[in-house]
Amino acid sequence: MSRTVNCIKLGREAEGLDFPPLPGELGKRVYESVSKEAWQGWLRYQTMLINENRLSLADARARQYLASQLDAYFFGQGADAPAGYTPPQN
C-alpha cells in the first residue's frame, strides 16, 4: 500500500515518495510534503536549469544553487526561470 501526502505543490492528496530524495532536513521536508507527481515535475525543471545554465554537478556551488531552487520551487515563491526562457503556449 502506498502512502499519501497532502502535496504542497499540487494542493491535493496524492501518492507520496517512497523514500526521502535527499539527505538532511530538506530531504525530510520534501518526503513529508511532496507527491511523486510533483517530484517528477521538479526533476524536469531541474534538468532544464542544469542545461540552460550549463551547470556542472561536480561544482559544489551548482549543487548548492539547485538545493536553493528546490526549496524555492516547493516551499517558496517559485524557482528561477532560466534567462530567455519562454514557457510553451498551450
UniProtKB/Swiss-Prot annotation:
UniProt keyword Iron, yes or no: yes
Entry's Gene Ontology BP terms: cellular response to oxidative stress
Matches recorded under InterPro entries: Fe_traffick_prot_YggX (IPR007457), Fe_traffick_prot_YggX_sf (IPR036766)
Keyword presence, Iron: yes
CC per GO annotation: cytosol
Keywords noted in UniProt: Iron
Pfam families: Iron_traffic
GO molecular-function terms, A-Z: iron ion binding
Gene3D superfamilies named in the record: Fe(II) trafficking protein YggX
Family of this protein: Belongs to the Fe(2+)-trafficking protein family.
Function: Could be a mediator in iron transactions between iron acquisition and iron-requiring processes, such as synthesis and/or repair of Fe-S clusters in biosynthetic enzymes.
Protein's recorded name: Probable Fe(2+)-trafficking protein
